[in-house]
Amino acid sequence: VAAAAYGTDTITKADKIVGPGNIFVATAKKLCYGVVDIDMIAGPSEILIVADENANPKYIAADLMSQAEHDKLASAILITTSKELVKNVDKELVRQVEDLPRKDIIKSSLDNYGGAVIVDSIKEGINLSNKIAPEHLEVLVDNPLEQLPNIKNAGSIFLGEYTPEPLGDYMSGTNHVLPTGGTAKFYSALGVYDFIKHSAFSYYPQAVLGT
């Protein structure tokens, strides 16, 4: 990162450094910012799921772990209107995690940065999600498209139980370099506009400016 930011005898100095990385990459980008532009300081990974009582606990558990397995510092949060769903998701987490090769990382992540919040309505759940501004947001409710206008802050949004977050990482084509740590309130996913800049210009003829 430093070589790209400052240049060396064999590496041309870059104007901008983008892309994901671990805590060391993120720290290096932060230290070099100003000498070179960066996209954002991203990580650790996050997933937040807003679900109603009809959501499938097997899917929710799998999707929570899809991010928890990334890093012991990753966060995985469920917001739901159903206490019963929380109980069933917890059972699924216990059952599914034992079959996964990164189970120790998942358990550490969920123990320290996982959780469930019970709300009175999906509207309240979406409002809470907007305050958290998660990197990845799944909306597992009846008619999820109806909730889209209410979502203000999220890096990438996944609507419906057949649109799991890993689709965004590997298949759907949406960029998976995303804002974390609440920065989705003012950052967007990496995109073409991150590589475009503009300049202001002025031109006054003498007749307009006067003498």
Where are the predicted features?
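Short acidic-hydrophobic, aromatic-tinged amphipathic segments that line or gate anion-handling sites
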Residues: 1, 116-121
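Conserved NAD(P)+-binding/catalytic subdomain of aldehyde/semialdehyde dehydrogenases
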Residues: 1-66, 70-75
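Short, solvent-exposed amphipathic alpha-helical segments in soluble enzyme
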Residues: 9, 32-35, 63-68, 92-96, ...
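A short, aliphatic-rich alpha-helical micro-motif
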Residues: 11, 110-111, 151-152
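General structural feature for long, well-ordered alpha-helical segments within catalytic domains
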Residues: 13, 20, 24, 28, ...
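Short loop-to-beta-strand entry elements in the cores of soluble alpha/beta enzymes
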Residues: 18-20, 40-51, 67-90, 106-117, ...
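Aromatic-enriched alpha-helical interface/lid elements that frame and gate functional surfaces
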Residues: 95-109
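C-terminal core of ALDH-fold dehydrogenases
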Residues: 122, 130-211
